[in-house]
């Protein structure tokens, strides 16, 4: 996994997952969810046909009258097209972690960088193909300064090499647990990645998982 894109700084500390994913729009409301980690695509619609990704960060994105708040970073150019989020410490704490990860993917995010994450949110990122990168708070600050000064210059997150790169900056190393790194590189969730390495029932397990979560797999069931 190597991703290059616009990075948007949104450094509010202790941002709860409920503020990312509104409680009123749950997975049960989705008409269809398609996740393709090969193409890195996640599409989801509500029954009314609207994109659920539009509901990410609703309390920040919209004013009380429903119009966009121009002060919110993702409502500004070029950050509307951001696929990398630079976040504050303890990002994604709370009880809506899985929904928060899905909303971030639906609004185009591929990578989130922060000094720390809510632990359950962090785990859920690997199940939905979102790369969570933990960086020192000072490093996050320096990266934010560079991005804010030249927002159109893209940032690259290279999972295979475990490095963040941006023109004019020294590459920034990061660490991902080897099993989680493998899960993202292979496009599987962590538990399944481990199990598929062992045991004679690996094929049966994969077939069962394919029937439960067909969107994870790039090819149709033989």
Regions found by a protein language model. Name each.
Residues 1-222:
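Cytosolic catalytic domains that perform sulfur/thiol-centered chemistry
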């Amino acid at each position: 996994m190597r991703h290059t894109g616009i990075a948007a700084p949104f450094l509010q500390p202790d941002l709860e997952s409920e503020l990312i994913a509104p409680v009123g729009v749950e997975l049960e409301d989705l008409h269809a969810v398609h996740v393709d980690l090969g193409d890195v695509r996640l599409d989801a619609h509500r029954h009314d046909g609207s994109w659920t990704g539009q509901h990410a960060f609703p309390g920040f994105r919209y004013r009380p009258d429903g119009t966009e708040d121009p002060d919110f970073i993702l409502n500004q150019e070029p950050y509307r097209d951001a696929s990398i989020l630079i976040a504050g410490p303890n990002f994604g704490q709370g009880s809506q972690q899985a929904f928060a990860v899905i909303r971030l993917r639906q609004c185009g995010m591929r990578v989130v960088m922060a000094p720390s994450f809510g632990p359950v949110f962090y785990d859920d990122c690997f199940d939905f193909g979102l790369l969570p990168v933990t960086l020192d708070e000072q490093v996050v600050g320096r990266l934010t300064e560079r991005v804010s000064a030249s927002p159109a210059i893209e940032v690259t997150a290279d999972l295979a090499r475990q490095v963040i790169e941006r023109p004019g900056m020294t590459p920034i190393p990061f660490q991902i647990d080897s099993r989680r790194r493998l899960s993202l590189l292979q496009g599987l969730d962590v538990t399944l990645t481990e199990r598929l390495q062992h045991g004679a029932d690996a094929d049966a397990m994969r077939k069962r998982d394919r029937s439960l979560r067909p969107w994870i797999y790039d090819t149709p069931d033989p």
